[in-house]
A protein has these predicted regions:
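Intrinsically disordered, low-complexity segments enriched in serine, threonine, and glycine
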Residues: 154-280
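Short beta-strand and beta-hairpin "edge-sheet" elements
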Residues: 107, 111-152
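Short amphipathic beta-strand and strand-loop transition segments with alternating hydrophobic
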Residues: 44-48, 64-68, 124-135
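Solvent-exposed loop and beta-edge segments used for protein-protein assembly and interaction
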Residues: 72-76, 104-106, 136-140, 177-179, ...
Length: 280
């Protein structure tokens, strides 16, 4: 429903008053109200969960479909309209402001954070054309459709670490979000002996690398966020050293992630840090 009138601090939609700080958003670090003087009104509400694309097949002579593993969430759409909170002094000024807004919104995929959910963000982009219309508001409004990747991500990563002066360590990790989250791991050499091998295990899956030569102060970085990979702290690709490279995720709740290390000669020592960005 289109806005009908404004009062201090609130936008009135029918008989419902919404606080302005509850319906706006930031995109790519800029805020629609604070940086562009616009309020955002959702056109049809907003999606809570994405549509699921089932991995299913039709088989001749069999009723219905056969469901296979591998369901995938699809993208989300957030559809709304931006309205100027103060009328531009002229049509030329309005056009200049609209071009600033268009440049902001069409700058590729960025973090989209709604004010009513400040600790979560979507990775979103505006791919459709932007249209200015006069049907909903006497001074006009800019129709905007965000296409978002299927998860809302926690603004802050969950982090846990453990140190060892031997060949093994257990990292106690607690993820407070529902969906499994890809793990990022750092194995930092804090001793004098080079680290020649490392195995990380989480939930039955494992990453195993051998034949390395990680010197004191250097690190191995493993990242399960796409594009999945492993590298040393100097940027060298570590995947050629991998004997096993399963997909590691943290699940909801407390869990233990184990690390097993192999060394050359010298004093053993390492710090293992595990990170995961929760998703909803």
């Amino acid at each position: 429903m289109a806005p009908t009138r404004k009062r201090a601090g609130c936008l009135l939609i029918g008989e419902i008053a919404l606080n302005l700080n509850e319906i706006n958003f930031s995109f790519g670090g800029l805020h629609c109200l604070r940086d562009f003087g616009c309020i955002y009104v959702e056109n049809k509400g907003h999606a809570i969960t994405p549509k699921i694309r089932r991995n299913e097949y039709d088989i001749s002579g069999t009723p219905g479909t056969i469901l296979m593993p591998g369901d995938l969430p699809e993208t989300l759409e957030f559809d709304g309209t931006l309205f100027f909170i103060r009328d531009p002094p002229s049509q030329a000024a309005a056009q200049q402001q609209l071009r600033r807004i268009a440049a902001w919104l069409t700058n590729g995929r960025q973090r989209l954070i709604f004010d009513y959910e400040p600790l979560r963000y979507y990775m979103a982009s505006v791919d459709d054309e932007l249209n200015w219309g006069f049907s909903d508001w006497i001074d006009g409004g800019l129709d905007v459709t965000f296409t978002a990747q299927p998860y809302a991500y926690a603004l802050d990563e969950t982090t846990a670490s453990a140190t060892t002066s031997g060949t093994s360590a257990q990292i106690n990790f607690v993820l407070t979000t529902g969906a499994p989250a890809p793990i990022r791991a750092e194995v930092l050499n804090t001793g004098t002996a080079p680290i020649t091998g490392a195995t990380l295990t989480a939930g039955g899956n494992a990453v195993q690398l051998s034949g390395m030569n990680i010197a004191s102060g250097d690190a191995l970085l493993i990242d399960m966020e796409p594009p999945i990979g492993a590298a040393f702290s100097d940027g060298e690709n570590a995947l050629p050293y991998a004997a096993r490279f399963d997909y590691l995720t943290a699940r909801h709740g407390p869990q233990s992630i184990s690390a097993t290390l192999a060394y050359g000669s010298g004093t053993k020592g390492a710090k293992i840090t595990i990170k995961a960005r929760g998703r909803f």
